[in-house]
Amino acid sequence: MSVPAFIDITEEDQASELRSYLKSKGAEISEENSEGGLHVDLAQIIEACDVCLKDDDKDVESVMNSIVSLLLILETEKQEALIESLCEKLVKFREGERPSLRMQLLSNLFHGMDENTPVRHTVYCSLIKVAATCNAITFMPTDLDQVRKWIVDWNLNTEKKHTLLRLVYEALVDCKKSEAAAKVMVELLGSYTEDNASQARVDAHRCIVRALKDPNTYLFDHLLALKPVRFLEGELIHDLLTIFVSAKLISYVKFYQSNKDFIESLGLSHEQNMSKMRLLTFMGMAVEMKEISFETMQQELQIGAEDVEAFVIDAVRTKMVYSKIDQTQRKVVVSHSTHRTFGKQQWQQLYDTLCSWKQNLSTVKSSLQTLSPTA
């Protein structure tokens, strides 16, 4: 992709024009080109370009596009430090101001570079940082498949890969994209190995807390399989996660009574935890029983008789459980419930169900062929 130039002249003259323009705006820069070559000129121009960022958007974009067009003709090994310097300027200059302009300038640079250029990673990270400051992350490509491809294309080492994923995660969280953020965090934690899992302690801790805090997240068993999370075994945060994975409400109540300060230190709401654990307990009951008496509901969920109906209605709204209320017989009739954990037993049940469907379809097909040989 070509980037519009500041003026259609030679690179040396273009650098000279940029120097003159910046000096006219008050920058401390010589109007004479450096004897060190274009990359030295660009280093000095980028260092002084702050002054033009105060101008009108069109003027700023014209100047910055000129700088970008010169950057892109440099040898790859000379680009990296200069691009990093320019990105830092655009991210930090009057942070919070004119985000759409800064995003446009970074986007011009990003799309003007070859797709496989490693330093493109720096530009992408800068775009994410600016987008997060103005709640514009939805306009950024953060799809995991695309991000995975870039990680490969840019040949990122482990540290840069983790930094990129963590940055995307934090931006999504800041912009209230909790579901997308959770997927990115799982991707991040899943990229650690047995050898470096201990380094992800903070990320694993944060991932668990975010998941527990999210009012729309009810399934947690996949987190237990992540190596950094397994590294937390024996700690209170892991014990708490295990309760939300498979235990009942009473287990959470006992945990809370012994660890009130810990729950508060995590920034978790006890009332929200109670509400979520009631639903999770109900889900577990609904898997095992197709009919649940009001009395059992009251006892297991620690709610009053007058609250059972409202609870069931709210539970059905989450689409984790499908059931109806039988007022006459004072019971809840379950038609379906999501499993809180999905292990070998659940896979076997799924296999048996699919085999049964296959057999039934074969029977239907045979019956149709009997009625009509051409069927």
Swiss-Prot record:
Gene Ontology MF term list: translation initiation factor activity
The Gene Ontology biological process annotation of the record reads: cytoplasmic translational initiation; formation of cytoplasmic translation initiation complex
Q: Where in the cell is it found?
A: Cytoplasm
Question: What are the PCI domain coordinates in residue numbering?
Answer: 180-339
**Function of this protein?**
Component of the eukaryotic translation initiation factor 3 (eIF-3) complex, which is involved in protein synthesis of a specialized repertoire of mRNAs and, together with other initiation factors, stimulates binding of mRNA and methionyl-tRNAi to the 40S ribosome. The eIF-3 complex specifically targets and initiates translation of a subset of mRNAs involved in cell proliferation.
- Summarize subunit and interaction data from the UniProt record for this chain: Component of the eukaryotic translation initiation factor 3 (eIF-3) complex, which is composed of 13 subunits: eif3a, eif3b, eif3c, eif3d, eif3e, eif3f, eif3g, eif3h, eif3i, eif3j, eif3k, eif3l and eif3m.
Q: Any idea what this protein is called?
A: Eukaryotic translation initiation factor 3 subunit M
